[in-house]
């Protein structure tokens, strides 16, 4: 279904696909008696394949615009997403829209449920930071003709609008800066390799290390689920029995602050003992210690451009996808210094 053709998949679509009557399909989907298991399974399979979603709202799908946009992100407690959500909501209100905000906790099943909830609320469009562990949620959006824009993450092989920052450049700048300070043993804490921003930041960091002739120890490239508990556990284990390192590149400010807290618990000072560089520059919008050296990208621009792009998609319907990649740069503050001699 073309983007912007906001038409829900109906029972008649399942009937056309399976050859069963609408009445039989309705009974199967409602798990009523009088339907063979084979027929029920065939109908359920077809319904899933074409993206059918039972509408939970009384009276069915409303016609016209609801003036509502769903914002779906991985972690609404993450300061980065809190900032972007706030900006998106403000921008939507300027255009007469209200927002519904949902979090996925990086779980694809929760992303799919959030999409189903958005469709059942008859939203006009979706701003989505995808988990990238599954395409099921995005497939539902496409099958139901729901306009959407990806924020902060992208799929290389997906025909969809997105607004991201130059993650590869940001990773390069972080690695280049630490290498120029003299660091050779750098711990890298990534998110999952399935996340485009994480993969691209690591690619840029690798490029910087290659240019400086610094070998990357695989034992110093770790994956975090971005939770405080996980980051603390990783630092605890490394300091007790892991390889030595003099600096840390964390793939988000959120992880960086948790890492600094863990280092301080072990009596290590930042940057006196260990240097730390983050990514996001949350402190461009919030003021709290420590002043973190980090990679900045324009969060306000990413948020406002995502809203503008989505509203344009809603108004104009099917067009070629728009891909926006915004610049990133290093912000030097107080958490990185040359390694101790």
What is each model feature region?
Residues 1-67, 340:
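N-terminal helix-turn-helix DNA-binding module of bacterial transcription factors
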Residues 17, 22-27, 61-77, 177, ...:
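Short beta-strand segments enriched in small/hydrophobic residues
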Residues 37, 41, 50-125, 203-206, ...:
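Amphipathic helical "hinge" segments at domain boundaries
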Residues 42, 79-94, 170-174, 196-215, ...:
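Short, solvent-exposed amphipathic alpha-helices that sit
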Residues 98, 106, 129-173, 194, ...:
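Flexible loop/hinge segments that line or gate small-molecule binding clefts
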Residues 163-188, 203-207, 228-236, 256, ...:
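Hydrophobic alpha-helical segments within soluble ligand-binding/sensing domains
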Residues 172-214, 219, 322-336:
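An alpha-beta-alpha
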Residues 232-341:
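Flexible loop/turn connectors
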